[in-house]
Amino acid sequence: MANKCVNALRWDGRGWWCAGVDGTGVADVRHHHGRTPSDHVLGLVGGGGAARSTASAWAELGGRIHQLPSRRMFEDVPYMDAMTSDAPDVIVDFDNKDVLDAEVLLLRSVYEPMDGTVDERAAAITGGVLDGRWLLVAQHLACWRLLWAPERAQDLPSLGMLLTQLLEAESLLATYA
């Protein structure tokens, strides 16, 4: 826990287990979109626990990190050797800033209510800007795969399938509002 970031807990009847799966979730989303750590520089906006977890996971997978201006900057972190000044190919925004760069795939950590059909909702979150629903789904899958039920990892749905199910649930729930 060199990152000092935990976002998942598990009680097994005898003790507590913890994990920080933000970084694993981001790596899974990027992999789903064809962006692998070894081939892409990750731009990070943020310096809190989620950003530290993401930087650590990206570095462990052989990636390089470019921290972009944010409220908190990294200081004395174990992955300093993975830091670069090279321009990022992909960006994750944990500070909810207006990062505008049409040349890179952007993942925002936040999401807001949407209107529309399932197809319209899917189109809204699959362009050059991915909203936080991607991270929400990827983190939950990572929790199940790594912490809650690793023995059932092969039974988990794919990231795309679970995201589609989330959009279908949101669309259905909107009909009751």
Language model features with spans:
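Phosphate/diphosphate ligand-binding glycine-rich loop within oxidoreductases
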Residues: M1-H33, I125
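A short helix->loop->beta-strand "cap" motif at the edges of active sites that frequently abuts
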Residues: L9-D12, G63, A102-V104, I125-G127
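Short acidic low-complexity segments
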Residues: R71-L100
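Adenosine-phosphate binding glycine-rich loop
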Residues: S109-A177
